[in-house]
């Protein structure tokens, strides 16, 4: 199984725990943390929400592989067992985290599923940490590992 996590993010300054969750998950899945950011995105984010969405869409257009899940504040709320079931859907799963303006309405229509990690707005670093922890937890649930009790 391959799990790709795509994020519009300036730097690779994530919490060290993300690397740990990727390492611990490696016995069940090949997980990649893919950050996208370039001068076009930076310029577009300064211009307008619409320009930013176009830049995000362009950065992500070649990343739509496997079962695609977008993170969105209005997405479906799952508990950990339901999230684990999502991980059973495909041999390749791609998660998408939008930039400062979220995912564009057009890009959201290309997703197989939209989920929300919280009703609250989260910083990218925190959202990513929560996502990687839930991926690890979901893989543990599916493997009957005692991490999830």
From Swiss-Prot:
Binding locations of S-adenosyl-L-methionine: 71, 98, 117-122
Does this entry carry the keyword Iron?
Answer: no
Q: Which Enzyme Commission number(s) are listed?
A: 2.1.1.177
The entry lists its GO molecular-function terms as: rRNA (pseudouridine-N3-)-methyltransferase activity
Q: Which Pfam families match?
A: SPOUT_MTase
Query: Where is the protein situated, by its record's location annotation?
Result: Cytoplasm
Its predominant location is cytoplasm
**Keywords of the record:** Cytoplasm, Methyltransferase, rRNA processing, S-adenosyl-L-methionine, Transferase
User: At the top level of its lineage, which domain of life is listed?
Assistant: Bacteria
Q: Which CDD domains match?
A: RlmH-like
A single GO CC term, please?
A: cytoplasm
EC class: transferase
Enumerate the catalysed reactions. pseudouridine(1915) in 23S rRNA + S-adenosyl-L-methionine = N(3)-methylpseudouridine(1915) in 23S rRNA + S-adenosyl-L-homocysteine + H(+)
Tell me how this protein assembles: Homodimer.
General function of this protein: Specifically methylates the pseudouridine at position 1915 (m3Psi1915) in 23S rRNA.
Supply the HAMAP family for this chain.
23SrRNA_methyltr_H
User: What protein family does this chain belong to?
Assistant: Belongs to the RNA methyltransferase RlmH family.
Q: What is this protein called?
A: Ribosomal RNA large subunit methyltransferase H
Tell me what organism the protein belongs to: Campylobacter fetus subsp. fetus (strain 82-40)
């Amino acid at each position: 199984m391959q799990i790709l996590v795509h994020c519009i993010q300036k730097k690779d300054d994530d919490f060290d725990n993300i690397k740990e969750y990727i390492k611990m998950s490696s016995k069940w899945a090949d997980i990649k943390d893919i950050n996208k950011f370039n001068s076009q995105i930076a310029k577009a984010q300064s211009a307008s929400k619409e320009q930013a969405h176009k830049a995000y869409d362009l950065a992500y257009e070649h990343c739509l592989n496997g079962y695609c899940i977008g993170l969105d504040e209005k997405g479906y709320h799952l508990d950990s067992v339901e999230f684990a079931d999502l991980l059973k859907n495909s041999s390749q799963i791609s998660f998408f985290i939008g930039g400062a303006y979220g995912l564009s309405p057009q890009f959201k229509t290309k997703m197989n599923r939209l989920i929300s990690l919280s009703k609250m707005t989260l910083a990218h670093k925190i959202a990513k940490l929560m996502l990687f922890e839930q991926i690890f937890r979901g893989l543990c649930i599916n493997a009957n590992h005692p991490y999830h009790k």
